[in-house]
Structures are given as structure tokens and as C-alpha cells.
Amino acid sequence: MIVDYEKDPRAKEAIAIWEKGVLKEKDGSMSDAINFYRSALKIHDNVESLYRKKILDEWMLHKKLSGLSMTTDAPDEQNETGKDDLSVEENAELQPCWILEILPDDILLRIIKKVILMSGESWVNLSMTCSTFSKLCFHDSVPFKTFAKYIYSKQIYDKMAMDLNGITDINTFEKEIWRGDDYRMLRERPYIKFEGVYISVVNYVRYGSNAESSLSLLKPVHMITYYRYFRFYENGQCLRLLSTDEPSAVVKHFSKENKPRHSHMCYWSLGFDYDFGHLKITRSDEKYTFIEEFQIKNQGNKRYQRLKWLSSIVVDKEGNASNCSLRNEKSFFFSRVKSFKDPG
């Protein structure tokens, strides 16, 4: 049922209170604004929609009046140039804020492109605000093209893997495989995420032994918990840490500028095996080279959120390789960290 807010006293009262909340929000007084919004909702539960309709009606009226004024001749030069501040204020009050009616789709798509470059999460959040943005965000090719160009330009591919597959240029390769279908490429081509940390939580049980003087038949049981952390950088570096410290104590300051004790700086690259989801992480010291390999996989509906172990190899200076046991190891899961957003 459509309510005529001009004839319904409750609707008019609720809109008036809602407008006070809008003014408070513009001034930065969010607590006062929320109080006004709550009061308005108690009077009329559909007040936000009525307020938006009122704004739209005012804008449409303004457009009609502007069209009429353009078709009438100016009485004289004095009236043309003698508009006082009141007219300016009236025009300012009628400025549009109903962007979905006022702005064409190409402008809205430019806004969406800017949002995508902020973060993929912001893109999803914007799409959920209304049906118009949902349609433009996920039923138009521009957003997918923007995100694909943004994220895949940051991926680093192993030079040897490219040579073995006869690939000289990754951009040419992706055009041959996906033929400009960015939506399909995003669904089929895994990528590394940079604005967060990949964390693996490992729990296992270790059985202890009784003291020599103990008469107990039961052996003590120890629950061992440790964490592995990866943070990837766009220049091919990767910060690695094995620690018993929980994420709440590690993640906030986990960076190559402030390296935690016992952390290592590694190098990462992608290969083309495992449906383009082959990840290799390497590091070296004076005696050994360590190679850890993973497959990038989905976590439920979240794409490319998980790193599944494939192998962990240690190679000495003579070239002798040893495989490390993965019996207790668990997959890594990506956790977004807002402060890791590249300011550039």
C-alpha cells in the first residue's frame, strides 16, 4: 500500500523527525541522528522510503520548473541579473540527492569502478544496497573487467612454469583462454589476496610419560596448538611466521617493516597446474632451500580463500631433497585486515 505522505499526519511527522536525523548525520552527530531515526521509525515503520520518495518528488518538480523557466523569455536584463540570495538558497535546497534517478548508468558505473579499486568487499557491499546497484555491479561487464584487471595485474607467475607451457606473455595467454570473458576468468582463475593474512591453525595431541615414581596407569595428554601465518606482497615477497601466539597478538603488527621474531621473508609465485591454482613459496638460508607448495581453493562460497598443502621440501646445498611430513598440517584460510589496504 502506497502512503500519501502529504495527507497522512503520521507520515508527515515521521518524515520531519527523519530529516532532523539527516541534518545531524551531516554534522557528524551520529548518536543524535540515530535517536531521531529511531523516533521516526516508531511513528512510521516505512519512513525511510517515504523520505526518499519526498526527495525524489521535490527533484522532479524542480526539473519541471526548470524546463518551464527555460521556455519563458526574460522580462528584462535587470531581472535576469538581479536574482537575490534567496533564489540561490532555494536552488541549493532543491539540489538532487536521489542519485539513481539523476545520474545515468555510465556515471554510476564509474562510481562502481572506484569502489572496486577500494576493495572487492566494498564492491559486494555496494551491490546489496539496492536492486539498481545489484544489477549494475553483477549484470554488467564493466565491474568484472575492472576487478579482473586490478587483481590479475598483481599476480606473479613462475618464469620456469611459463617457459614449460610455452607462454611468453600472460596477457596474451589469458585472452586465448578466456577470450575477454572476465566473469568466467574470475570464476576459473585463482589469485592471491593481499589485503589480509592467511592463517593455519594446527591442533594435535601428544602423549606424555609418567614420572618413574608414578603409580598411575594413565599417561598425560598434551594438546599442542600452533599457528602459521602468510602475508603476501605484490612485489613477490611473502612474510612467513610459525608461532604459538594467537592471531589477536600477531596480525595487527604483522608486516615486513615490523618483522616478528623468528619470521622469514620468502618469495612466492604461481604456476599453471591445479587449474591455475599452483602456489609455490620459497626461502633459503646458508644451508638449505625450503620449498612449500599449495593449491588455491575455495572455502564454501568464498572464492580462492583457502591454501591446501601439497608438499613441503627441504633441499641442501648438494641438491639432496627431503620431504617433510604434512600429517599434522592444516589448510590456510584468508582473513581480511582493513589496515593492510595499500594507501597508494
From Swiss-Prot:
Source organism, top-level taxon: Eukaryota
List the coiled-coil residues: none
Q: In which pathway does it act?
A: Protein modification; protein ubiquitination
Question: What is any one of the record's Gene Ontology cellular component terms?
Answer: cytoplasm
Has keyword Cell division? Answer: no
Q: Does the keyword RNA-binding apply?
A: no
Pinpoint the residue ranges of every TPR repeat in the record. Answer: 14-47
The molecular function GO annotations come to: protein-macromolecule adaptor activity
InterPro entries hit by this protein: F-box-like_dom_sf, Hrt3/FBXO9_C
Which Pfam families does the protein's record reference?
Answer: FBO_C
Q: Name one GO biological process term.
A: cellular response to methylmercury
Q: Which residues form the F-box domain?
A: 98-148
The UniProt keywords, alphabetically, are:
TPR repeat, Ubl conjugation pathway
Q: What does this protein do?
A: Substrate recognition component of a SCF (SKP1-CUL1-F-box protein) E3 ubiquitin-protein ligase complex which mediates the ubiquitination and subsequent proteasomal degradation of target proteins. Probably recognizes and binds to phosphorylated target proteins.
Subunit info here reads: Interacts with SKP1. Component of the probable SCF(HRT3) complex containing CDC53, SKP1, RBX1 and HRT3.
Name of the protein in question? F-box protein HRT3
- What species is given as this protein's source? Saccharomyces cerevisiae (strain ATCC 204508 / S288c) (Baker's yeast)
